[in-house]
């Protein structure tokens, strides 16, 4: 009989599973090589249909229950968030065999301290994306980066970037639920946690995988 590998400490521990979920997600905001650095982010369009895309996780905090992403304020995605802030973020770590889904409400913040700090702390090349002359997703005649010809292949300076600051916005997702799935030959483990506003705490339960 083949002996199954030993399982991690969180395998049958609801509290440790919750901590590991946040450990993985928080690592994704600081480690560009982490699988959690580029999760799938889902919003809802005007027809109620889900719209998915890969985004870079810029910040994550279990203390404030927030995830932060950056977007173009003119984008379809931004319009969806303004119309309906319901958002779901999916992480998958193949090596750890972990899937984590975090869901909540998103605020679109084009101005304010959070957006200003995020803009200032981004590299010039990252901010160059917001110099596109038209809104992301609009049809164009041929293949193009959408950037003005004079900045193609060049690093913009602060003066050049300043005029395009209004195109930048942060997406701040306030997490209200966390779902966890760990895959194991010995038997999968699944759990979820809901934020309880009245108690200011998380309430978790095991689920059938």
Per-region residue spans from a language model:
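Binding-site signature for planar aromatic cofactors or substrates
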Residues: 1-209
